[in-house]
Protein backbone atom coordinates (compact mmCIF):
# COMPACT_ATOMS: atom_id res chain seq x y z
CA UNK A 1 0.00 0.00 0.00
CA UNK A 2 0.99 3.65 -0.26
CA UNK A 3 1.40 5.99 2.69
CA UNK A 4 2.49 9.61 2.85
CA UNK A 5 5.12 11.22 5.05
CA UNK A 6 4.88 14.97 5.55
CA UNK A 7 7.96 16.92 6.68
CA UNK A 8 8.08 20.16 8.65
CA UNK A 9 9.02 21.98 5.42
CA UNK A 10 5.64 20.93 3.98
CA UNK A 11 7.15 18.42 1.53
CA UNK A 12 5.20 15.15 1.16
CA UNK A 13 7.04 11.88 0.49
CA UNK A 14 5.15 8.85 -0.91
CA UNK A 15 6.25 5.40 0.30
CA UNK A 16 5.35 1.87 -0.79
CA UNK A 17 4.91 -0.23 2.35
CA UNK A 18 3.30 -3.36 3.82
CA UNK A 19 1.13 -3.32 6.98
CA UNK A 20 3.72 -5.71 8.47
CA UNK A 21 6.60 -3.23 7.94
CA UNK A 22 8.19 -2.00 11.17
CA UNK A 23 8.70 1.69 11.88
CA UNK A 24 12.42 0.93 11.54
CA UNK A 25 11.77 -0.32 7.97
CA UNK A 26 9.82 2.85 7.18
CA UNK A 27 12.69 5.03 8.47
CA UNK A 28 15.09 3.07 6.23
CA UNK A 29 12.85 3.81 3.22
CA UNK A 30 12.84 7.51 4.15
CA UNK A 31 16.65 7.38 4.37
CA UNK A 32 16.77 5.85 0.86
CA UNK A 33 14.57 8.63 -0.53
CA UNK A 34 15.76 11.65 1.46
CA UNK A 35 19.15 10.72 2.92
CA UNK A 36 18.04 11.38 6.53
CA UNK A 37 19.63 8.88 8.97
CA UNK A 38 16.99 6.87 10.89
CA UNK A 39 18.40 8.00 14.28
CA UNK A 40 17.51 11.59 13.36
CA UNK A 41 13.93 10.72 12.39
CA UNK A 42 10.85 10.88 14.62
CA UNK A 43 7.60 9.69 13.05
CA UNK A 44 4.28 10.89 14.43
CA UNK A 45 0.81 9.48 13.67
CA UNK A 46 -2.44 10.51 15.36
CA UNK A 47 -0.41 12.60 17.81
CA UNK A 48 1.77 9.67 18.91
CA UNK A 49 5.48 9.11 18.37
CA UNK A 50 5.99 5.72 16.68
CA UNK A 51 8.34 3.15 18.23
CA UNK A 52 10.93 1.44 15.98
CA UNK A 53 10.03 -2.17 16.82
CA UNK A 54 6.28 -1.82 16.21
CA UNK A 55 4.56 -2.34 12.84
CA UNK A 56 2.31 -0.09 10.80
CA UNK A 57 -0.63 -2.41 11.54
CA UNK A 58 0.09 -2.10 15.30
CA UNK A 59 -0.72 1.60 14.95
CA UNK A 60 -3.67 0.98 12.58
CA UNK A 61 -1.85 2.86 9.81
CA UNK A 62 -3.73 2.07 6.62
CA UNK A 63 -3.36 2.92 2.95
CA UNK A 64 -3.01 6.62 2.23
CA UNK A 65 -2.49 7.47 5.90
CA UNK A 66 -0.20 10.46 6.50
CA UNK A 67 2.68 10.31 8.98
CA UNK A 68 4.54 13.41 10.14
CA UNK A 69 8.33 13.45 10.12
CA UNK A 70 10.14 15.53 12.74
CA UNK A 71 13.92 15.69 12.81
CA UNK A 72 15.61 14.71 16.06
CA UNK A 73 18.56 17.06 16.57
CA UNK A 74 21.77 15.53 17.89
CA UNK A 75 21.12 16.75 21.42
CA UNK A 76 17.64 15.18 21.54
CA UNK A 77 16.63 13.74 24.92
CA UNK A 78 13.63 12.62 26.93
CA UNK A 79 12.35 14.40 30.00
CA UNK A 80 9.38 13.67 32.25
CA UNK A 81 6.65 16.00 33.44
CA UNK A 82 4.72 15.00 36.55
CA UNK A 83 1.27 16.49 37.15
CA UNK A 84 -0.45 17.07 40.49
CA UNK A 85 -2.69 14.06 39.74
CA UNK A 86 0.45 11.88 39.70
CA UNK A 87 0.35 11.30 35.92
CA UNK A 88 3.77 11.36 34.22
CA UNK A 89 4.11 12.70 30.67
CA UNK A 90 7.19 11.85 28.56
CA UNK A 91 8.48 14.56 26.21
CA UNK A 92 11.08 14.53 23.45
CA UNK A 93 13.09 17.74 23.78
CA UNK A 94 16.37 19.45 22.96
CA UNK A 95 18.56 21.23 25.55
CA UNK A 96 18.04 24.36 23.43
CA UNK A 97 14.22 24.17 23.72
CA UNK A 98 12.70 27.11 25.57
CA UNK A 99 10.25 26.61 28.41
CA UNK A 100 7.66 28.06 26.03
CA UNK A 101 8.42 25.22 23.56
CA UNK A 102 8.05 22.67 26.34
CA UNK A 103 4.66 24.12 27.32
CA UNK A 104 3.57 23.87 23.67
CA UNK A 105 4.56 20.17 23.65
CA UNK A 106 2.53 19.64 26.84
CA UNK A 107 -0.41 21.37 25.17
CA UNK A 108 -0.07 19.00 22.18
CA UNK A 109 -0.14 15.97 24.48
CA UNK A 110 -2.56 17.06 27.19
CA UNK A 111 -4.55 19.98 25.77
CA UNK A 112 -3.56 22.35 28.61
CA UNK A 113 -3.06 25.92 27.33
CA UNK A 114 0.48 27.22 28.00
CA UNK A 115 -0.83 30.24 29.91
CA UNK A 116 -2.34 27.88 32.51
CA UNK A 117 0.91 25.93 32.96
CA UNK A 118 3.58 26.58 35.59
CA UNK A 119 6.64 24.33 35.35
CA UNK A 120 8.79 23.74 38.43
CA UNK A 121 12.29 22.19 38.53
CA UNK A 122 14.54 22.01 41.59
CA UNK A 123 12.04 24.18 43.46
CA UNK A 124 12.15 27.01 40.90
CA UNK A 125 9.39 28.18 38.60
CA UNK A 126 10.73 28.15 35.02
CA UNK A 127 10.49 31.34 32.92
CA UNK A 128 9.17 31.07 29.33
CA UNK A 129 12.11 32.70 27.55
CA UNK A 130 14.81 30.57 29.20
CA UNK A 131 16.03 27.22 27.82
CA UNK A 132 16.25 23.77 29.40
CA UNK A 133 20.05 24.05 29.37
CA UNK A 134 19.83 27.40 31.23
CA UNK A 135 18.27 25.47 34.11
CA UNK A 136 20.67 22.50 33.75
CA UNK A 137 17.74 20.21 32.89
CA UNK A 138 19.28 17.04 31.50
CA UNK A 139 17.99 13.80 30.01
CA UNK A 140 15.43 12.01 32.16
CA UNK A 141 15.02 15.00 34.49
CA UNK A 142 11.53 15.35 35.98
CA UNK A 143 9.68 18.67 35.90
CA UNK A 144 6.54 19.30 37.95
CA UNK A 145 3.48 20.81 36.28
CA UNK A 146 1.22 23.02 38.38
CA UNK A 147 -1.89 24.56 36.86
CA UNK A 148 -2.02 28.33 37.01
CA UNK A 149 -5.41 29.23 38.38
CA UNK A 150 -7.29 31.94 36.60
CA UNK A 151 -5.99 34.27 39.34
CA UNK A 152 -2.58 34.50 37.59
CA UNK A 153 -1.58 38.15 37.17
CA UNK A 154 1.21 40.54 36.27
CA UNK A 155 2.90 42.84 38.75
CA UNK A 156 5.73 45.33 38.31
CA UNK A 157 8.89 45.74 40.35
CA UNK A 158 10.67 49.10 40.16
CA UNK A 159 14.36 49.28 41.07
CA UNK A 160 16.26 52.28 42.44
CA UNK A 161 17.83 52.74 38.97
CA UNK A 162 14.32 53.32 37.58
CA UNK A 163 14.20 50.00 35.69
CA UNK A 164 10.82 48.23 35.81
CA UNK A 165 10.65 44.41 35.84
CA UNK A 166 7.41 42.61 34.90
CA UNK A 167 6.61 39.39 36.78
CA UNK A 168 3.94 36.69 36.29
CA UNK A 169 2.63 35.79 39.74
CA UNK A 170 -0.29 34.26 41.64
CA UNK A 171 -2.00 35.98 44.60
CA UNK A 172 -0.93 32.91 46.61
CA UNK A 173 2.79 33.39 45.80
CA UNK A 174 4.92 34.18 48.84
CA UNK A 175 7.31 37.13 48.93
CA UNK A 176 10.06 34.48 48.91
CA UNK A 177 8.69 33.16 45.57
CA UNK A 178 8.64 36.70 44.18
CA UNK A 179 12.28 37.25 45.21
CA UNK A 180 13.21 33.97 43.47
CA UNK A 181 11.54 35.23 40.26
CA UNK A 182 13.50 38.48 40.54
CA UNK A 183 16.69 36.44 40.99
CA UNK A 184 15.85 34.45 37.82
CA UNK A 185 15.32 37.66 35.83
CA UNK A 186 17.98 39.94 37.32
CA UNK A 187 20.48 37.70 39.12
CA UNK A 188 20.04 39.48 42.49
CA UNK A 189 20.22 37.00 45.41
CA UNK A 190 17.01 37.01 47.50
CA UNK A 191 18.94 37.81 50.69
CA UNK A 192 20.01 41.13 49.13
CA UNK A 193 16.45 42.09 48.15
CA UNK A 194 14.03 44.19 50.19
CA UNK A 195 10.58 44.61 48.63
CA UNK A 196 8.43 47.59 49.60
CA UNK A 197 4.71 48.08 48.90
CA UNK A 198 2.55 50.92 50.22
CA UNK A 199 5.50 52.00 52.37
CA UNK A 200 5.87 48.61 54.08
CA UNK A 201 8.74 46.14 53.82
CA UNK A 202 7.31 42.75 52.77
CA UNK A 203 8.09 39.66 54.88
CA UNK A 204 9.27 36.47 53.11
CA UNK A 205 6.68 34.09 54.51
CA UNK A 206 3.64 36.25 53.70
CA UNK A 207 1.73 36.10 50.38
CA UNK A 208 0.89 38.80 47.86
CA UNK A 209 -2.79 38.50 48.82
CA UNK A 210 -1.86 39.06 52.50
CA UNK A 211 -0.64 42.51 51.46
CA UNK A 212 -3.58 43.10 49.07
CA UNK A 213 -1.16 43.26 46.13
CA UNK A 214 -3.32 43.00 43.01
CA UNK A 215 -2.75 42.82 39.27
CA UNK A 216 -0.52 45.57 37.92
CA UNK A 217 0.52 46.71 41.41
CA UNK A 218 4.05 48.13 41.59
CA UNK A 219 6.52 46.97 44.24
CA UNK A 220 9.77 48.81 44.94
CA UNK A 221 13.01 46.86 45.13
CA UNK A 222 15.70 48.15 47.47
CA UNK A 223 19.02 46.35 47.68
CA UNK A 224 19.93 45.19 51.15
CA UNK A 225 23.48 46.32 51.72
CA UNK A 226 25.85 43.77 53.11
CA UNK A 227 25.26 45.51 56.46
CA UNK A 228 21.80 43.89 56.69
CA UNK A 229 21.44 42.09 60.03
CA UNK A 230 19.05 40.43 62.43
CA UNK A 231 18.15 41.82 65.84
CA UNK A 232 15.81 40.51 68.51
CA UNK A 233 13.04 42.31 70.37
CA UNK A 234 11.87 40.83 73.66
CA UNK A 235 8.37 41.67 74.92
CA UNK A 236 7.06 41.72 78.49
CA UNK A 237 5.35 38.38 77.89
CA UNK A 238 8.77 36.87 77.20
CA UNK A 239 8.10 36.48 73.46
CA UNK A 240 11.09 37.21 71.21
CA UNK A 241 10.56 38.79 67.78
CA UNK A 242 13.26 38.56 65.09
CA UNK A 243 13.67 41.56 62.79
CA UNK A 244 15.67 42.11 59.59
CA UNK A 245 17.23 45.58 59.84
CA UNK A 246 20.04 47.81 58.57
CA UNK A 247 22.37 49.77 60.89
CA UNK A 248 20.98 52.88 59.14
CA UNK A 249 17.35 52.06 60.11
CA UNK A 250 15.80 54.62 62.45
CA UNK A 251 14.06 53.60 65.67
CA UNK A 252 10.87 54.73 63.90
CA UNK A 253 11.55 52.16 61.14
CA UNK A 254 12.10 49.47 63.74
CA UNK A 255 8.79 50.31 65.43
CA UNK A 256 7.05 50.08 62.02
CA UNK A 257 8.55 46.59 61.52
CA UNK A 258 7.27 45.59 64.97
CA UNK A 259 3.84 46.91 64.02
CA UNK A 260 3.92 44.79 60.82
CA UNK A 261 4.78 41.66 62.81
CA UNK A 262 2.78 42.19 65.99
CA UNK A 263 0.14 44.82 65.22
CA UNK A 264 1.29 47.17 68.03
CA UNK A 265 1.01 50.84 66.98
CA UNK A 266 4.37 52.66 67.13
CA UNK A 267 2.99 55.29 69.51
CA UNK A 268 2.39 52.54 72.10
CA UNK A 269 5.95 51.18 71.81
CA UNK A 270 8.98 52.09 73.93
CA UNK A 271 12.24 50.40 72.97
CA UNK A 272 14.99 49.97 75.56
CA UNK A 273 18.62 49.01 74.87
CA UNK A 274 21.44 48.98 77.44
CA UNK A 275 19.07 50.63 79.92
CA UNK A 276 18.28 53.56 77.60
CA UNK A 277 14.98 54.45 75.94
CA UNK A 278 15.60 54.83 72.19
CA UNK A 279 14.51 58.02 70.40
CA UNK A 280 12.53 57.76 67.14
CA UNK A 281 14.78 59.93 64.95
CA UNK A 282 18.04 58.18 65.88
CA UNK A 283 19.46 55.13 64.05
CA UNK A 284 20.49 51.71 65.31
CA UNK A 285 24.13 52.57 64.60
CA UNK A 286 23.78 55.74 66.73
CA UNK A 287 23.13 53.44 69.68
CA UNK A 288 25.80 50.90 68.61
CA UNK A 289 23.12 48.24 68.17
CA UNK A 290 24.79 45.43 66.25
CA UNK A 291 23.71 42.13 64.76
CA UNK A 292 21.90 39.82 67.18
CA UNK A 293 21.52 42.57 69.79
CA UNK A 294 18.36 42.29 71.92
CA UNK A 295 16.07 45.27 72.47
CA UNK A 296 13.31 45.27 75.09
CA UNK A 297 9.82 46.38 74.15
CA UNK A 298 7.69 48.11 76.80
CA UNK A 299 4.09 49.05 76.04
CA UNK A 300 3.01 52.63 76.59
CA UNK A 301 -0.51 52.36 78.06
CA UNK A 302 -3.20 54.75 76.86
CA UNK A 303 -3.17 56.91 80.00
CA UNK A 304 0.51 57.70 79.64
CA UNK A 305 1.42 55.09 82.27
CA UNK A 306 4.08 52.50 81.39
CA UNK A 307 4.03 48.80 82.03
CA UNK A 308 7.18 48.05 84.03
CA UNK A 309 9.94 46.31 82.10
CA UNK A 310 11.23 43.03 83.45
CA UNK A 311 14.76 42.48 82.21
From Swiss-Prot:
Note the subunit structure.
Answer: Interacts with SKP1-KMD2A and SKP1-KMD2B complexes.
Could you say which residues form the signal peptide? Answer: none
Alphabetized UniProt keyword annotations: ADP-ribosylation, Cytoplasm, Isopeptide bond, Membrane, Mitochondrion, Mitochondrion outer membrane, Nucleus, Phosphoprotein, Repeat, Ubl conjugation
Specify the species. Answer: Cavia porcellus (Guinea pig)
Family assignment from sequence similarity: Belongs to the ubiquitin family.
Q: Which gene encodes it?
A: UBB
| Limits of the Ubiquitin-like domain | 1-76, 77-152, 153-228, 229-304
Pro-piece positions: 305-311
Task: Locate the site labelled Interacts with activating enzyme.
Answer: 54, 72
User: Where are the Phosphoserine modifications?
Assistant: 65, 141
Q: Could you say which residues are annotated as the site Essential for function?
A: 68
Would I find Mitochondrion among this entry's keywords?
Answer: yes
Q: What is this protein called?
A: Polyubiquitin-B
Covalent cross-link (Glycyl lysine isopeptide (Gly-Lys) (interchain with K-? in acceptor proteins)), residues: 76
Give residue numbers for the modification (ADP-ribosylglycine): 76
